[in-house]
Amino acid sequence: MIYAELAGGLGNQMFVYAFARALGLRCGEGVTLLDRQDWRDGAPAHTACALEALAISPGVRILSEPQFAKTHLPRQNAAKALMIKYEQRRGLLARDWQPFERRMAPLLNMIGLHFATDGYTPAHRGPSRDFLAWGYFQSERYFADAAGTIRRELRAKTPPTGSFAAAIAAARWPVAVHLRRGDYLKPENEILQVCTPEYYAAAVAAVAAAKPEAELFVFTDDEPWAREHLPTAGLPATILPQGAAANDLALMQRCRGFVLSNSTYSWWAQYLADAPDKIVWAPDRWYAHTKRSDLYLPGWRRIATQTHP
């Protein structure tokens, strides 16, 4: 059995699902996702499991038993705890851990653990009866061989309806603009403070230059700020009230253009979009410091970002 621990909001949970599901298909094994409720105490970035609103495979089980790994996978869980402690003591967010995690992967895979917080670290199943995955797995390379399956299974079970869905359908060239503020503005998340007002101004100007007929649909966790400060470059703009994560994601997917924040949530919106002529504008850095990202895809138009003071 392949086990993977869920973390973060819907976008991060989708990457964990995609990694584990693709590995399960490769190995012909079942998948259980461990919904760590205990992580959410005092940690709002770790939200409730939202995957059940998506068309995930009925063969993927979601288990809400916080101590499962500690009780049933003691060897893998102990190795995971040591890796977390080592990286946290040396600055989990401030450093690029991919080279270290790649060096450790063969040994960890042999004992039934895959640990990957940064970039792409290939996973090898190893001989252990049970296999535990912990990390963020934020790279399409983890599931490229199962991309069709992943795209089908990570769509909303219920297609969006209502006035906003109708407005997007009626627009000549709808563009989803994702503006994330909230937890990104906290001092401890300085590494995520990339998408400044200047970034959005430049990105929207690029949209207007490329597609003068574009209409903006703004998805944000800070509607008042967006109404007062978000530049539109003269394009018509609709600022949507924040709704359920899966429904908003499904609305974004119906657009043809995408202005991304450095968020996995907007990454999935563009990835799952069907428009053959879609255009993606993204910040040229995913992190404010030296950490690298494997999230960039061919064809994206990168917008220069200022170094955070």
Model features per residue range: what roles?
Residues 10, 205-290:
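Donor-binding and catalytic core of enzymes assembling or modifying cell-surface/extracellular glycoconjugates
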Residues 13-25, 200-208:
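Histidine-anchored nucleotide/phosphate-binding helix
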Residues 1-3:
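Extreme N-terminal starter segment of soluble prokaryotic enzymes
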Residues 46-206, 210-211:
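Secretory-pathway luminal glycosyltransferase catalytic domains
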Residues 288-309:
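Leloir-type glycosyltransferase catalytic cores
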Residues 9-11, 37-41, 137-141, 180-184, ...:
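Short, solvent-exposed loop/turn segments at secondary-structure junctions
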Residues 5-15:
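A short, glycine/small-residue-rich beta-strand->loop->alpha-helix junction that serves as a flexible
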Residues 27-41:
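A short beta-strand-loop structural module common to alpha/beta enzyme folds
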